[in-house]
Amino acid sequence: ITTELVALDADFGDSVDSVITNLATLVHDTGRATDVAGLAQPAIDREAKAGTGVPGGVAIPHCRSEAVTEPTLAFARLGRGVDFSGPDGDAQLVFLIAAPAGGGKAHLKILSKLARALVRKDFLEALRSAPTKEEIVRLVLDVVNAEKPKKKPATESAAPAAGAAGTGSSAASNGSSSAAT
């Protein structure tokens, strides 16, 4: 996400299709997609199968597309909400995650990190009240690039135990290790 991929208090129309198309235009205009329709249509099609509205007045349409040249995150804070089939009404905060068709699963990691942050009321309020595009970019990058330091020590401390269990191969074949699983 860059400031060129952020729209604040935007009027992107009153339909899901128009919001997605306007966000796809931002992606195209930054050189990260070769064709607006080639990006917008897969996201619109995916949205038609299952709405991407989440609690808090947020939507996260996402897709893979041949038109996308690099994984991209675009954001719009809408002047008026649009119905993305969210559980609590219209969405005013919309993130478009666009990934190349042949790309890996990086966009799913972004989606996961973003979704975790969007349940925090302080994060939602910061997005709603941010005065500048630069502030939006900072807020989003802080979340998307955040590491989870609390989980790493647990994983590292579990690794030696797993390795120790693995050295007793006869115990593993007896099924005694299944109790630890």
Feature roles, as predicted:
Residues I1-T181:
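Cytosolic covalent-transfer regions centered on His/Cys nucleophiles
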